[in-house]
Amino acid sequence: MIDEKSIEFDFPEGILGFENIKKFIIKDSKYKPFSIMQSINKDVSFLVTSPFNFLSEYLPNIQEKDWSDIKAKEEDEKVILCIINMHVNDYKDITANLKAPIIINKKKLLGKQAICTNEKYSLHHKVFKE
């Protein structure tokens, strides 16, 4: 994932539902392997993690245009995160949005929310197996 403790990223298109928020920081969380994606000028934050932490074979088929929008050409620039839903009573019910991952160019500090074209992924993928 991201190495530094807290890094600011520009999201020129914002995040779906939060299009007016263009700047976020990503910082470590006390709940590993999760991080916090926090807006710098609004009280909005998301819990995020790499989908590969719980689904090693994740293949979202991100459109090349999405990577181009954040100027990510090389594989070592690209990071994929997913938003986590923890508003549950039991940790086994925690879900991840695999349908609309956050993609980041970690060298240019740009990000966007992409739409995954692989139909097998959903907005509410269970993170923990029972």
Swiss-Prot record:
SUPFAM superfamilies: BH3618-like (SSF141457). Acts as an anti-CsrA protein, binds CsrA and prevents it from repressing translation of its target genes, one of which is flagellin. Binds to flagellin and participates in the assembly of the flagellum. It comes from Borreliella burgdorferi (strain ZS7). GO terms for cellular component: cytoplasm. InterPro entries: Flagellar_assembly_factor_FliW, Flagellar_assmbl_FliW_dom_sf. This is Flagellar assembly factor FliW. Disulfide bonds: none annotated. The lineage of its organism: Bacteria, Pseudomonadati, Spirochaetota, Spirochaetia, Spirochaetales. One of its GO terms (biological process) is bacterial-type flagellum assembly. Belongs to the FliW family. It is found in: Cytoplasm. Pfam families: FliW. Its main location: cytoplasm. Keywords: Bacterial flagellum biogenesis, Chaperone, Cytoplasm, Translation regulation. Gene3D superfamilies: BH3618-like. NCBIfam families: PRK13285.1-1. Interacts with translational regulator CsrA and flagellin(s).
